Amino acid sequence: MRLSLPSIKKNILLLAAASTLFLSPSLALGAPASPDSASVASIRDKALQSDSFAYDIVEGLTTEIGPRQGGTEAEARARTWSVSKLKALGFDNVRIEEYQMPTWVRGEETASIVAPFPQKLAIAALGNSGSTGDAGLEAEIVYFPTIDDLRAAPDGSLKGKIAFVSHNMKATQDGSSYGAFGPARFVGPNIAAKKGAAAIVIRSIGTDYHRNPHTGNTNFDPGVTPIPAGALSIPDAENLERMIARGKPVRLKLKLTPKNVGMQTSGNVLAEVKGSNPELPMIVIACHLDSWDLGTGAIDDAAGCGIIGAAAKHLQSMGQPKRTVRLLWAGAEEVGIWGGRDYGEKHATEPHAFAMESDFGAGKVWGVDFRLPESASALRGQIVSALAPLGVVPRKELAGGGADVGAIIAAQKLGIIDLQQDGTKYFDLHHTPDDTIDKIDKAELRQNVAAWVATLALVANYDGELKPEAAR
């Protein structure tokens, strides 16, 4: 029988469709389906051009709450504020999960050179610093150009002295210098205490040349009595080095009077975008709600909460995703990752598949790292394609997540994507009084939201395996 041209075309289309079912496992076996690329591009571009949710969160949190150190009354007000905001944005299951934590608070802070060149220095106590007492203390400085030089000092050699540890931290796009030079703060005071030092001052872990010291947490081993520990502003640290280079003994008068106020309440704020398929393990996306007490915590980490909150809000506008997306606005990250650890303990057996975190300011996203199974290579490719118009390129490094999702990742070996932000200027502001909203670039903040929602739209609607093979 002779077929008409329309019939031939129809049969060709039917054959093509049939062959696709046989040849394409994704269609034939009902494997993961994702939103079409046009839908993802549309929501990405909408966020890039007109998102206001992220900045609104940053502005509200920094204006109406301000500094919000973990375990304090200000952090409690931040939790109340966050619940109200997340409910107003239409999220599901908004709630607070409280926990108790030991709490340290700042006191008086002064430092001055007594001899040979008397002058004041700008200083901030490090979290968990011991106290000099109200009278303060005066002692000779022993200079260590690096943390390794301090490590090499003989035991007992610092008795009655004030250790001064310097370093040469430089700005990097990926923030890698923080890991290299941060130990001066992370462990320097503990090492100095073990070697008998009466106190320690360090060059701030930062890259700016403002006379603003950078605070941050330090920790002492069990059984080690905390000694007074402070960070000098970088200009003051360099001035102190010049004094030492003149070859005369340098004496420092130091007064730091922080105190421990015992166990206090902190907590995490949780919210959700409910998924359509309860059989699929959820996604958790995180920021931290607390901040240090010197600035208003705009870049660290109100920006992160704004980014993930806005991305989840835009995701809602696409319709219900397959997977539930849980927002974790973690408490008390700065002073010991208490919120992230509490979440990991309380939700260790609740099925999760994947985690992301935003805690590196509001600089533009420039790179993307993955930790996904080989079976998710198509998803990886879709994400790379969706991010390319934003100037985001795939990197070879494996994604690692962040502090607030670290415990749940460890408990369940989750899949991870890291959206790498430009941190070139981040450590100019980190943990200083300069961490304020005027440092947020609105266009760069929107670019973050665009990258996040494009990624979330694809991951939250992917019903294949997200955990790396080694985790299963």
Region spans (language model):
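Noncatalytic luminal/extracellular "stalk/propeptide" segments of secretory-pathway proteins
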Residues: 32-36, 40, 48-50, 59, ...
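N-terminal capping segment at the start of a domain
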Residues: 34-72, 212-217, 290, 358-363, ...
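Soluble metallo-hydrolase cores and metallopeptidase-like ectodomains found primarily
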Residues: 38-39, 115-155, 218-298, 310-313, ...
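Catalytic-core environment of secreted peptidases
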Residues: 50-75, 83-89, 93, 155-157, ...
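Extracellular/luminal Protease-associated
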Residues: 72, 122-228, 296, 394
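Metal-dependent peptidase/peptidase-like ectodomains
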Residues: 118-120, 139, 227-229, 237-238, ...
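His/Asp/Glu-rich mid-to-C-terminal helical/loop segments that flank catalytic regions of hydrolases
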Residues: 313, 317, 427-472
